[in-house]
Amino acid sequence: MTDPRFDPSRHIRAPRGNQLTCKSWLTEAAYRMIQNNLDAEVAEHPQSLVVYGGIGRAARNWECYDKILETLRRLEDDETLLVQSGKPVGVFKTHENAPRVLIANSNLVPHWANWEHFNELDKKGLMMYGQMTAGSWIYIGSQGIVQGTYETFFAVANQHFGGKPQGRWILTGGLGGMGGAQPLAATMAGFSMIAVECDETRIDFRLKTRYVDRKATTLDEALAIVEDAKQSGKAVSVGLLGNAADVFAELVARGITPDVVTDQTSAHDPVHGYLPQGWTVAQWRDKQKTAAAEITAAAKKSMAVQVRAMLTLQQRGAATLDYGNNIRQMALEEGVENAFDFPGFVPAYVRPLFCEGIGPFRWVALSGDPEDIYKTDQKVKELIPDDPHLHNWLDMAKERIAFQGLPARICWVGLKDRARLGQAFNEMVKNGELKAPIVIGRDHLDSGSVASPNRETESMRDGSDAVSDWPLLNALLNTAGGATWVSLHHGGGVGMGFSQHSGVVIVCDGTDAASERLGRVLRNDPGTGVMRHADAGYDIAVNCAREQGLDLPMLK
């Protein structure tokens, strides 16, 4: 039987320039961004519609993809397209300030919210796994998580090494769409890194895009490269071909302790995201369609081996953190009772930023011209002049990050800055400084847009880790505020049953109406994050809410 999700003839690239294919820039933005998600420079397996994160897709199948594009081309300025798990299911009359697209991906009634039920529906063609930015059409390649990873490693250096990471190294696993950001983020923060990856093509892709410096095929070779870099006073990243469980356990056996240990394999998806020990990549992929239960059992057993190694390395002095792929949960289910003894990265390092609504703000130049991004970089510096850490990030990003697909930038800013940046970008479009409109979005990993007890909302002060009202309110408010497209997903990052989250995208097309929408959406969206954390009792969030004039009725 032919797989409707695989088409080797597809080679997708988003349109560039300032000529419209659709009836307005609002629909043109969605039209270009879904295609950009599937650009070979951007996506992990574009001919299978897979963008990143195991099986995170942009559309349910190729028929649905084609119909989405066809519908966007004819969509009027007062109509809204509804997309259900990657399938365009309806167009309804709304109004000009309503979203042009509303997306719901991978959502299941809680009792049935597990991989087994999802996989049944997926096989029947009734669902699609949207991950976070795959199915919401705002993935920008590995840059999308570079700064968040950099900020985390920067915080690790400050907390554990007195702000001096030089000569120290990080051990991790996974060089996929998300994990591929780790090597560059590490060297930007001053650490060396060994990143274990079982798929050699992924290592080669990260070499090509300059996210990793070197490739090694043995642990000895990788260790030698890191040691040479230490002696020369430089930071280096190494993609090591191998199985993460094997390598982590081997380091324990040898008595070698890295300075920092983490993991970004796609452990959230035990069928498609984690190679079991003793299996070849070819065997693993061959069995994915026919032996899901066998793979799951073998993968979780191997995850337990890796997590036990991480716990041992933690006991030996390594700063050890979970990077949000749910590997601790998988190991716990496999009998590793103390799997959660090492913390997740959000409560350990990132939550103070979330309390101020600071998170992964990103924008894309629909013109396709990198100069538009460089001009917006400069505008950010002008509007936020007293933040040397942010300026340093922008300088490093310009120098070291290769654009994938349409030129884009990510920049962690919060409640006090997002709206004015968006409106400034809109003014640049209006006065012709930029060659075409800018589209602004963010990861679903943000301060007010996700409920994920093993990641973003782990160890909330008031115990509200699993309360998922917050991302629902976020999506509703962004819809009411006039975002260009809004998405509501389940299972991103940590897998089925473990998260709910929402996404938002808004277009700067240079119009006065856009400026008003930007002012609403880019204040409200991070404002819900400050609200959520203030409600949970975080003083930083309470103070931020007061300083920024948020109206929170229960705030004392």
From Swiss-Prot:
The keyword Hydrolase does not apply. Binds 1 NAD(+) per subunit. Residues 445-464 are annotated as: Disordered. Its EC number is 4.2.1.49. It is found in: Cytoplasm. Residues 455-464 have a biased composition (Basic and acidic residues). Pathway: Amino-acid degradation; L-histidine degradation into L-glutamate; N-formimidoyl-L-glutamate from L-histidine: step 2/3. The active site is at C411. GO terms for molecular function: urocanate hydratase activity. Catalyzes the conversion of urocanate to 4-imidazolone-5-propionate. Belongs to the urocanase family. This is Urocanate hydratase. The gene is hutU.
